Amino acid sequence: MKQITVLLLIVFAVVGCSNYQKALKSSDAKLKVRTADSLLAAEKYSKAINLLEQVVPAYRGTDSAAPVALKYANALYQDGRYPESGYQFETYRKSYVLDPNREYATFMIGKSLYEMAPIYSKDQEPTEKALAKFQDYINIYPNGEYLAEANMLVDEMQFKLDKKAYEIAENYFKRAPFSRGGYTAAIASFENFIVDHPGSEFQDDAAYHLIDSQYSYAIKSFSSLIPERLEVAKEYYDTFATRFPNSEYKEQADDLMEKINSYNN
């Protein structure tokens, strides 16, 4: 029985391969599309792509152009060829402005870019591009079918960008004692982070380290400059205490404030 099953599988594979080769060499566009549909159902995306890319140009200007173009873009996405799928979904969006699947294509442009986005520690240009495309989708389709997923992915990618930016500022802070102008660089980085990433969960981290950076900068200054620079640290503390009364850094921030006050006294 087992041998019969194996033989049947071999026969089906040979027949399938024969059908694919026949369609590949045929000039019949409809045969190519039917065979591609069978291959897509079997998750044989690479072979389906080979057939669809032959017929997409042939169907341009016909009623079947949009469905075939969408199949092609989807096949590229499923095959993990995200730069190409993103391009094809973008082409679809621009070419078929009244098509009911235009919303889906607009969403999938962002999804293709999302799949190319690296971990947060790497260059985040693909993440920024994906974020922009999802924002386009959200703006165009505020009640869209894919809105919930788009918002979820936006939150995920924004967190990556926030974490990347915060760690850059944190690295300036860690290197500050060992580099000329290190504390001013850390201060500028934390200030920029607070302004540029207003919804980030790292806001209180940045606000606390801003106090710490300014305090360290002040006490390492010439004596004539210390009071003025400590006043700035106090201002940072006041902002922190107002914005984050329950922060995990509250005790540490209070300790810094005591040091500032005792220094002034």
What does each model-identified segment do?
Residues 16-265:
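Acidic, polar-rich low-complexity tracts and alpha-helical solenoid repeat scaffolds
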Residues 1-17:
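Sec-dependent bacterial lipoprotein signal peptides
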